[in-house]
């Protein structure tokens, strides 16, 4: 890589930005992908292969992501980007979510879920933080275990706003500031409407024996 400060204006004007693909809609198993950057553990390396999975969910704090896995062999410490055959970025390489038996296969976090975060970082926008990891409630859980529709809390960050507010692991978020929450996406969108320091009302349903 070369610092932009070392490039003259003519060279800079000839450069073009990489377009971002919609990784949620355009990626499917079998698609050809290219790993660029440092996939092999040393600078300016490249890898070529196909996507093997596009539906693995990563449950992060306050936001979920999609893990794109490939059959490209690389380094356990790889980094860089994953592009499709049209040259559009579909993901950022991240090996930390790989299973031990797949530690040298290149994986990436889908770019679509990262776009808003990248925009916020570029514009120095502070993101609200509640401190919960959530997942969608499956139809089977609703049918057989009477779990209500909403964002099911699978983990809580220590000393977070959620923990201090009395929210527990196993609770289901069903509304935020009066807006109904039926999924992880609803939760993320509603939280994104808030600003750091805002006081919000969170409606939860808590398990009590065999009901909520």
Model-derived regions, located:
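Beta-strand/loop subdomains of soluble extracytoplasmic proteins
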Residues: 28-34, 38, 43-57, 66, ...
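PDZ/PDZ-like domain segments forming the peptide/carboxylate-binding groove
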Residues: 16-21, 71-76, 80-81, 133-175, ...
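C-terminal cap/linker of serine protease catalytic domains
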Residues: 89-146, 211
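PDZ-domain C-terminal substructure recognizer with occasional recognition of PDZ-binding tails
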Residues: 116-128, 141, 159, 168, ...
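Active-site region of chymotrypsin-like
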Residues: 3-19, 46-105, 149-154
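Active-site-proximal beta-strands of protease catalytic cores
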Residues: 26-39, 70, 79-100, 108, ...
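Conserved active-site neighborhood of the chymotrypsin/trypsin-like protease fold
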Residues: 1-42, 76, 181-184, 201, ...
């Amino acid at each position: 890589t070369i610092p932009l400060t070392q490039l003259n204006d003519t060279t800079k004007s000839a450069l073009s930005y990489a377009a971002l693909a919609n990784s949620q809609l355009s990626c499917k198993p079998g698609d050809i992908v290219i790993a660029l950057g440092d996939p092999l553990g040393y600078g300016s390396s490249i890898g070529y292969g196909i996507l093997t999975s596009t539906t693995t969910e990563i449950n992060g704090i306050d936001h979920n992501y999609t893990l794109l896995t490939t059959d490209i062999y690389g380094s356990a410490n790889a980094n860089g980007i994953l592009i499709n055959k049209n040259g559009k970025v579909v993901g950022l390489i991240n090996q930390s979510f790989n299973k031990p038996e797949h530690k040298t296969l290149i994986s990436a976090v889908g770019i679509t879920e990262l776009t808003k975060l990248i925009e916020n970082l570029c514009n120095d926008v502070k993101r609200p933080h509640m401190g919960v990891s959530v997942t969608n409630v499956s139809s089977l859980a609703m049918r057989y275990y009477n779990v209500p529709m909403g964002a099911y809390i699978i983990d809580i960050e220590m000393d977070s706003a959620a923990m201090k507010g009395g929210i527990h692991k196993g609770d289901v978020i069903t509304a935020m500031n009066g807006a109904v929450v039926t999924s992880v996406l609803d939760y993320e969108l509603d939280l994104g409407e808030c600003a750091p320091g805002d006081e919000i009302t969170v409606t939860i349903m808590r398990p009590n024996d065999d009901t909520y």
